[in-house]
């Protein structure tokens, strides 16, 4: 859950540039066809948690521009989340910033940089020839200065607010997907993470799950398909059957539905934790390299566990951050008990 971060990005007119539709390359068939409405393109080509902290800003844009079609530029696998935001109309499949955005030059009315404030994201948006732009202050862009050390929800809500689009950073709720919940009222133990720096040890997850299962709670282990072997290892160490492992088995909307109906979510600082926030489900969130002051949950039934005094903060490290390793099994069980799960 990272972006380019900080150099200085806004709503400003600009000279035409060359985008995917101006001769630089053909627009792929996966690009949504125009439907006659003016369009907003919000760029945030990152992961699930990054989308969820941008929801308040997206909802602000939806309210401010009810006649516009809002396209969200991000990876294709996030598509099932778009209708759940009640803000985004369609996804523009975008895998990072290495290639030009797959949209016709001059088609977009308003380009919004929710990706970061660096030269890469600005350059990709400048190429598409939008009539207006929103972003942080930087060369050629009007907008607020980039601020370090603030909550991401606040960052993006305050960005669009600066540009005249009121947004509430606590307006982060999602609609519950219209899918069957495979395990209502389960304790969801999300064992995966994008980077090793956020991987709490298998034996500790197993100890927590073993205790909660012995107390009569239904435990379900989640993660991506790539993380299924890790989830199976946790289940095995906890003495629980492979049937408790849903990692790799759930489409994204079904995963959202599982979290929306959970009795408790236990997770590192990942998309699963942000889903628990979006559905106001009780959660215990284990923080490693990312500070809770920037990525922590909103007010609600959420407990943050970490030791900031030993944080290294290397997100892309292959080894768990000391701030995460400082969290003990007993701390997690005590936090779960605080939410009525013991």
Positions of predicted regions on the chain:
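Catalytic machinery of carbohydrate-active enzymes
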Residues: 1-342
């Amino acid at each position: 859950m990272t972006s380019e971060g900080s150099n200085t990005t806004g709503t400003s007119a600009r000279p035409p540039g060359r985008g995917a539709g101006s001769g630089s390359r053909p627009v792929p068939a996966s690009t949504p066809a125009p439907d006659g409405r003016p369009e907003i393109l919000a760029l945030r080509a990152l992961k699930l948690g990054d989308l969820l902290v941008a929801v308040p800003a997206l909802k602000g844009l939806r309210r401010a521009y009810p006649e516009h079609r809002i396209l969200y530029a991000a990876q294709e696998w996030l598509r099932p989340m778009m209708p759940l935001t009640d803000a985004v109309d369609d996804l523009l499949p975008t895998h990072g910033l290495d290639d030009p955005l797959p949209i016709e030059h001059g088609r977009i009315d308003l380009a919004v940089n929710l990706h970061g404030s660096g030269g890469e994201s600005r350059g990709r948006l400048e190429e598409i020839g939008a009539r207006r732009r929103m972003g942080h202050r930087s060369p050629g862009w009007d907008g607020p200065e980039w601020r370090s050390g603030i909550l991401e929800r606040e960052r993006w809500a305050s960005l669009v607010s600066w540009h005249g689009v009121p947004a509430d950073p606590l307006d982060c709720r999602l609609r519950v997907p219209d899918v069957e919940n495979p395990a209502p009222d389960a304790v969801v133990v999300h064992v995966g993470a994008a980077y090793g720096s956020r991987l709490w040890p298998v034996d500790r997850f197993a100890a927590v799950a073993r205790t909660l299962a012995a107390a009569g709670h239904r435990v379900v282990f989640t993660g991506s398909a790539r993380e299924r072997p890790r989830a199976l290892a946790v289940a095995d160490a906890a003495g629980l059957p492979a049937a408790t492992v849903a990692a790799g088995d759930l489409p994204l909307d079904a995963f959202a539905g599982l979290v929306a109906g959970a009795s408790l979510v236990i997770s590192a600082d990942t998309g699963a934790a942000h889903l628990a926030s979006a559905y106001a489900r009780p959660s215990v969130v284990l923080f490693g390299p990312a500070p809770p002051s920037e990525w922590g949950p909103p007010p609600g039934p959420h407990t943050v566990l970490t030791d900031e005094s030993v944080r290294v903060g290397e997100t892309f490290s292959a080894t768990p951050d000391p701030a995460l390793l400082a969290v003990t099994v007993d701390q997690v069980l005590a936090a779960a008990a605080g939410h009525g799960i013991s």
